[in-house]
């Protein structure tokens, strides 16, 4: 059984990680341990590079907390060019996989508050009245009318980032 450390305690992110690992390696093939670690970037990262750096930093910090795992996974959400997205970084002892998620364009009324220094999650909670929306369906669920959720979009990116770990062409 694979020991997977998720560098997050966010249920939406953990669900995406668990689902992707089960699909790639088989149902029940992994045990996920969640740890809370720092990203080393602002609470609301801006731009692709800052967001990816946050995910890479979380993986590095998770490795320090739990060095005996088989995989370390981080999902860092950010804002880039008026849209929300995330970077997924997965590492094993000898390999790294990274993938950027799909992007969701955000309404200007939301972006104004985020640009003023507020994080997207709290802004969306104020807008919707849903407490801790970032730990649930997120802005993605709200603006797609539930057709997609934060977790479903993250899931796709985790599957993509896992490609180097199970596809022989990468070796």
UniProtKB/Swiss-Prot annotation:
Listed cofactors: Mg(2+); Mn(2+)
Ligand binding (substrate): 8-13
The reaction(s) this protein catalyses: XTP + H2O = XDP + phosphate + H(+); ITP + H2O = IDP + phosphate + H(+)
Highest taxon listed in the record's lineage: Bacteria
EC numbers for this chain: 3.6.1.73
Positions that bind Mg(2+): 38
Record note on cofactor: Binds 1 divalent metal cation per subunit; can use either Mg(2+) or Mn(2+).
Enzyme class: hydrolase
InterPro entries: ITPase-like_fam, Non_canon_purine_NTPase, NTPase/PRRC1, YjjX_NTPase
Annotated keywords: Hydrolase, Magnesium, Manganese, Metal-binding, Nucleotide metabolism, Nucleotide-binding
GO molecular function annotations of the record: ITPase activity; metal ion binding; nucleotide binding; ribonucleoside triphosphate phosphatase activity
Gene Ontology process terms (BP): nucleotide metabolic process; thiamine metabolic process
Function: Phosphatase that hydrolyzes non-canonical purine nucleotides such as XTP and ITP to their respective diphosphate derivatives. Probably excludes non-canonical purines from DNA/RNA precursor pool, thus preventing their incorporation into DNA/RNA and avoiding chromosomal lesions.
Family: Belongs to the YjjX NTPase family.
Subunit structure of this chain's protein: Homodimer.
NCBIfam families associated with the record: inosine/xanthosine triphosphatase, PRK05074.1
Stated name of the protein: Inosine/xanthosine triphosphatase
Gene source species: Klebsiella pneumoniae (strain 342)
């Amino acid at each position: 059984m694979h020991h997977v450390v998720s560098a997050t305690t966010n249920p939406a992110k953990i669900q995406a990680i668990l689902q992707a690992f089960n699909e790639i390696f088989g149902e029940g093939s992994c045990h996920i341990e969640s740890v809370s670690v720092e990203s080393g970037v602002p609470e609301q990262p801006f731009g692709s590079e800052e967001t990816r750096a946050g995910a890479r930093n979380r993986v590095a910090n998770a490795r320090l907390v739990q060095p005996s795992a088989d995989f370390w996974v981080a999902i860092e959400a950010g804002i880039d060019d008026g849209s929300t997205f995330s970077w997924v970084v997965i590492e094993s002892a000898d390999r790294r996989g990274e993938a950027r998620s799909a992007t969701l364009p955000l309404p200007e009324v939301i972006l104004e508050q985020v640009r003023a220094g507020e994080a997207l999650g709290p802004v969306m909670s104020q807008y919707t009245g849903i407490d801790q929306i970032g730990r649930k369906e997120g802005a993605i669920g709200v603006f797609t009318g539930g057709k997609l959720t934060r977790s479903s979009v993250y899931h796709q990116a985790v599957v993509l980032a896992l490609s180097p770990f199970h596809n022989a062409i990468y070796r």
